[in-house]
Amino acid sequence: MIKLRLKRFGKKREVSYRIVAMHSTTRRDGRPLEELGFYNPRTDETRLDVPAIVKRLKEGAQPTDTVRSILTKAQVFEQLKA
């Protein structure tokens, strides 16, 4: 199963995340199938590749809880329904 989840990167205590599509059995920092965006919890900055995310969701990818809340804030699910 393909999941949309966060991949950690950055220095200690200055962490940020990439939003990626990867198989559910792949380790957290393993090689992703596709990078779909960026999230920095310190500054609350988010950059998303919305068309690619919508494509992955239509193909059946399941977002994790944290990614789901980020996508809800960015109103990606409204574009999925349209």
UniProtKB/Swiss-Prot annotation:
Gene Ontology MF annotations: structural constituent of ribosome
GO cellular component, one term: cytoplasm
Keyword check for Ribosomal protein: yes
GO terms for biological process, alphabetical: translation
Entry-linked Gene3D superfamilies: 3.30.1320.10
Superkingdom of source: Bacteria
Pfam short name (any one): Ribosomal_S16
Keywords: Ribonucleoprotein, Ribosomal protein
Family to which the UniProt record says this protein belongs: Belongs to the bacterial ribosomal protein bS16 family.
Protein name, UniProt field: Small ribosomal subunit protein bS16
High-level lineage: Bacteria, Bacillati, Cyanobacteriota, Cyanophyceae, Synechococcales
